[in-house]
Amino acid sequence: MTKQLLTQKYTNDVQQNSQKHFGYLTERMYSYRDKVLDKKPFIDAERAILVTEAYQKHQEKPNVLKRAYMLQNILEKMTIYIDDETMIVGNQASSDKDAPIFPEYTLEFVVNELDLFEKRDGDVFYITEETKEQIRNIAPFWENNNLRARAGVMLPEEVQVYMETGFFGMEGKMNSGDAHLAVNYQKLLEEGLIGFEKKARKAKADLDLTKPESIDKYHFYDSILITIEAVKTYAERFAILAKKQAKTANAKRRQELLDIASICEQVPYYPAKTFAEAVQSVWFIQCILQIESNGHSLSYGRFDQYMYPYVKADLEAGRETEDSIVERLTNLWIKTITINKVRSQAHTFSSAGSPLYQNVTIGGQTRHKEDAVNPLSFLVLKSVAQTHLPQPNLTVRYHANLDKSFMNEAIEVMKLGFGMPAFNNDEIIIPSFIKKGVSEEDAYDYSAIGCVETAVPGKWGYRCTGMSYINFPKVLLITMNNGIDPASGKRFAPSYGHFTQMTSYKELKEAWDKTLRYLTRMSVIVENAIDISLEREVPDILCSALTDNCIGRGKHLKEGGAVYDYISGLQVGIANLSDSLAALKKLVFEEKRLTTLEVWQALQSDYAGPRGEEIRQMLINEAPKYGNDDDYADSLVRECYDVYVEEIAKYPNTRYGRGPIGGIRYSGTSSISANVGQGRGTLATPDGRHAGTPLAEGCSPSHNMDKKGPTSVLKSVSKLPTDEIVGGVLLNQKVNPQTLAKEEDKQKLIALLRTFFNRLHGYHIQYNVVSRETLIDAQKHPEKHRDLIVRVAGYSAFFNVLSKATQDDIIARTEHAL
């Protein structure tokens, strides 16, 4: 039955054959997967009520203690449950896939959208009248009393215009925690929370309280001790519940529940001794971190590296078989999909599909520069293939000597058509990290975080990626309009001349440089103001305790407790910028086939009028395009992008000089689905794009402008300064499943990837292996495609939960042949 049901989600023989290769879920895990996916996501007010209780009771205490008591109150009182099918326990909300509310960050959008959650075009949530009433009851306490309110007043007057118009896309950052990191799971498994507790106690005892800085450290250490005890209590509650359920269970389930109880009495407080304990310990923390904070991209790190010793020992001792390990892994991945987050309607435009970006990284190299692939690496691939879910977000670290059979298996998973794994390239990422100040040993130990971002797990500060999303095409329009945003009519930058008065491309380029530098500075001001607010208002204690060197310094993450602290700025619409510049330079300034006035009027009318469409077709068809290995277009965007790389590096982050190595900014192109949201507010652009339509995502070419095949795309991307875009270079590609039908086709793709990574120094690539026809049919008949998963940007999502605008954007992507 399982085999029959699981193959129904595939529409072609290629994917069915790949599924046969990896095998199928066990009956219990298939049942569990089905149960979770069938569950409607509801808004859950329980956490919000418990947070309100704690904040009211501990109002006078320092924020680190208030946050510790908050988590304690939640973990001691929240609803817990153990599903019949699961071997792993721990829940984020009152029911699977329900979304808890985080009023200490914001409650404003929740209250405003109470009657709208079920009416959304995408990212729909359900809500009961009782929950609405509960939220309304606590709302007065949080009015002007949370992160969003305080961050809002922290913003200087000079940047208010960008917030009012949504230019920087800061909705997520003002409503959420930071996250974007992986804690030190290896140390957790080896030492248990008791090890962190001992360090905090010793550090507290060693303080000289006559030193002013020791007072804050004293309270920070106390908050860690309270938090660790709360986590211990949470695990013990599950041990008690498991024993209770065992009394009425059948013999087989009774023993399993008693085993669960024993495991929960051991971890995460004490070190893990077995694979089952290690998985449970990691899941407890992964889950609780997302109860403590609503920041996303809390990633598992290098799962196959820190977990393999337990797998190896259990296999050798006969405690586990490969099949039992795979089943427990599939259980973990299904638990991972139960975590949920509700975003404001505005935020969903840049994070479509309710993603949590919980990344698992496998492969790569060891700290000693050897191939890190081990037997667990293969089992992770197999388990992810069997579960066929958008979470976890699976990344393979590629390097020149990567095990060939492992690479083959990774491509087999990719053929299943759910957008995984993505590939990150050691050959460019490791040298880039070392260049920025990361030790060689740590650079070799990096993992993917969230989408395509990278960091050293357990040693990196919050938010290795930016959140301001500088809209490059809109910056160009502002540049052309003498510093005024043509959409809002508001001044965004100083006057550097109007496009209609320019007589050369050089003038336009000089104005671009000045405008981009100015707006980059403004984005830094916005991010700093919000970062300061995050530091003061919502310190995350558990997350800090599990990140080196927070206990050693006596500082939480936002104060500069981590070993490293780098963040990136993000950009949207790189390809639109390239194609626009190429069209303007060639058709206006070089060939003079169009005047500046004609182009400007066409843009302002969205290509309406007598010559509007004619001009649009000229811009589209008669100028070079990025993605075709054309130096004309590729060099223009490189020149303009270099300005951003140079400018963003000038500005340290708020942790600079406070302990961590780094404290600086660099570039990144991981724009997730912001290309759709940002496109909504961007007028027509000189590449022929209509107003309000999506921009190009990541560093991928504009849809259907890449005419010369995948190799040309890779060559164009490689001309970007990838060694400086350390925050991630997001490249999406799409191929028809039939393109990979034969073994020789798969080997062609592997050869293409090796060329991209070894010779062209590509940073990242990911594939949608799905046909346009399947996507169109899924849009028309969603009930037939419940399991259809697509790669949106640096993450995958169920196609049916996406808004129509995001679905259309994915359908429109170029479909390549090899």
PLM region spans:
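Extended non-globular scaffold/tether segments
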Residues: 222-236
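Heptad-repeat amphipathic alpha-helical coiled-coil interaction surface used
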Residues: 204, 232, 239, 243-246, ...
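Structural signal for well-ordered, non-membrane alpha-helices
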Residues: 236-239, 243, 524, 645
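Conserved catalytic cores of very large enzyme subunits
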Residues: 2-221, 252-259, 270-818
